[in-house]
Amino acid sequence: MEEKKQQNVTIKGTKDGITLHLDDCCSFSELLIELDEKLSTHYYDGDGRSLIEVHVKVGNRYLTEVQQEEIRTLIRNKKNLVVDSIKSDVITKAEAIAWKEETEIVPISKIVRSGQVLHVKGNLLLIGDVNPGGTVIAGGNIFVVGSLRGIAHAGYYGDSDAVIAASVMNPMQLRISDVAMRAPEEKEDGAEAAECAYINENNHIVVDRLQLLTHLRPNLTKLERGIV
């Protein structure tokens, strides 16, 4: 009995076009040959008037930029096919390091004094105060276990879901992504309590009770593992 040939390329039609699942165990040259054969069989060159979007998934295979371009060129040569995306489950070491820096919690114990700027790529956990004139900046969230009386900028790289939380919230300015808020009104003596700031549905920064944070941003509970 003849052994059934392993299928290295699987084509699935979707409402958005077609998805190509490419095997991650065979050689790249074998993959290209079978991909060309499959596309030639299932999709003819046609007149090129109706473009079909192609989503390519390569599993646990790392593709260089040159290899990605080879796949794009092969598919593009079918005239009515255009590559929308090529997705791999594998990332480079540089990408992994960048992801870690952007998502980790950086604990720092200090007082940020006037004129000083503290900047981290990920989430900042500051154990200490931010004095008037001091600035803290984070690519993610900012948590201040102390008094925030200076400037805080969370979501520095464009994350509008970032939040700012402090034991005592009395800042000169709050900024989340590209949205800014001037200092809120002075609180009455003894009225200071832990608060959080976030961007609401109207794209305005709102300062509210810290207890609301888990409801507003439920994914923040995943960060607990980085703290404890």
Swiss-Prot record:
One of the Pfam families matching this protein, by short name: MinC_C
Keyword Cell division in record: yes
Matches recorded under InterPro entries: CAP/MinC_C, MinC, MinC_C_sf, MinC_N_1, Septum_form_inhib_MinC_C
Keyword terms of this UniProt record: Cell cycle, Cell division, Septation
GO terms (BP aspect): cell morphogenesis; division septum assembly; regulation of cell septum assembly
Cysteines engaged in disulfide bonds, as pairs: none
Keyword flag Cell division: yes
Signal peptide: none
Stored Gene3D superfamilies: 2.160.20.70, 3.30.160.540
Assembly and oligomerization: Interacts with MinD and FtsZ.
Entry function: Cell division inhibitor that blocks the formation of polar Z ring septums. Rapidly oscillates between the poles of the cell to destabilize FtsZ filaments that have formed before they mature into polar Z rings. Prevents FtsZ polymerization.
Protein family (similarity comment): Belongs to the MinC family.
NCBIfam families: minC
HAMAP family: MinC (MF_00267)
Protein name: Probable septum site-determining protein MinC
Originating species: Bacillus cereus (strain G9842)
Gene name for this UniProt entry: minC
